[in-house]
Amino acid sequence: MSESLGSVPGSLRSGVISPGLSLGADISSFTEYLRAHAPDQLPQARAEAMGLHRAADDIPHGTTIVAVSYPGGVILAGDRRATMGNLIATRDVKKVYITDEYSAAGIAGTAGIAIEMVRLFAVELEHYEKLEGVPLTLDGKVSRLASMVRGNLGAALQGLAAVPLLVGYDIDHDDPTERGRIFSFDVAGDRHEEFGGYQAIGSGSVFAKSSLKKLYRHDLDEASALAIAVEALYDAADDDSATGGPDIVRKIFPLAAVVDAGGAREVDAESIEAAARAIVERRAAEHEGGPR
């Protein structure tokens, strides 16, 4: 499994069943198993542990995630900043996760809940494959994640929303050039497939989508899709204080994953840094001698 599962707490690993608890042959959903036997391990229980009486601004929130599809694959990228109200909580949070062999998810919203949700989702996919002997279809993965988002609705209504952006490579699609697919969700768990080739979520999503609208082409390759994803995050950070741009001094750059016929994998840091530096240098040259 991907490295993202290595950071899942032991109590959430699909291979760990507490003594005396029977899974039940008809339960192929690890989330439903937790709901029945260990509800305190569900992401929405995290909201109760945080205390819903606390102001949402007192809890770290993650922003902004973008996805870009290209013939034969899809790129998912996210900035690194998490905020608490007007404060920067952290500059290097991880918001992009490999969830199984052919999917990846990015998170926006209440960081603690969102991270636990996507980790549990990864375990859910592994658990299903172990029991059924086959992986879930991409549409099945989308339905499972939508159900998990819906389960957090109560906390979302209290200001603790957690919203993912899911990308995947659909090995069952008839057209190989259309197998990279993008799905977004609202806080009530409704799913939306994005057919325009790109999507963004989080506080900087309006600015990121405006950037992608100008940069996107249907004939992109992997490298150019990564470049415009990073540039969209750069543009979002330019106007949204909750989105972190490339930090040249600290060498903190966005994180990204690519999902294609070869599977899901993280984009190496060197490629992302090179893309970010190229954007910064080009923008600096464009503004040279102009207004500051």
Swiss-Prot record:
Its EC number is 3.4.25.1. One of its GO terms (cellular component) is proteasome core complex, beta-subunit complex. Residues 1-62 form a propeptide. CDD domains: proteasome_protease_HslV. Component of the proteasome core, a large protease complex with broad specificity involved in protein degradation. HAMAP family: Proteasome_B_B. This is Proteasome subunit beta. The lineage of its organism: Bacteria, Bacillati, Actinomycetota, Actinomycetes, Mycobacteriales.
